Amino acid sequence: MVSLPYAAALAPPVHSLSSPVLLPGSAQLVIVAGGGRDLTWPPGLIASHLLRASAGRLVQALLHGAARGADQAIASAADQLGWLQISCPAAWKQHGRAAGPIRNRQMLERSLELLADLPLGAGLLVIAFPGSRGTASLL
């Protein structure tokens, strides 16, 4: 006969929303992703690339530019993966042609704010899918 404390020690841990699992920082990640408006990859292919790039780490948030093309596919992929996504649309009327690069800088700044709330060692991953010159300002 196995004593209850020993049996309980062998049982897998039970976690609920009221008792979150704390992961080491190195296991957590924030992703900023973007690409061109003409990108026609299906969301499943984008999701595959995102999963491979995240390498099994827990993605706390994925930021994208909320534009047509790559950003729409990135948003759909994040939904498929169950990841929190943060849409960051450009303010075209306010900034004109500079709106895209300004938005990209704001996404990077926001991702650093998110990282500051995570344990030491959490990572930032910037992914640029095929795109235009505007995508380059994300890097």
Regions found by a protein language model. Name each.
Residues 2-139:
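Acidic/glycine-enriched connector segments
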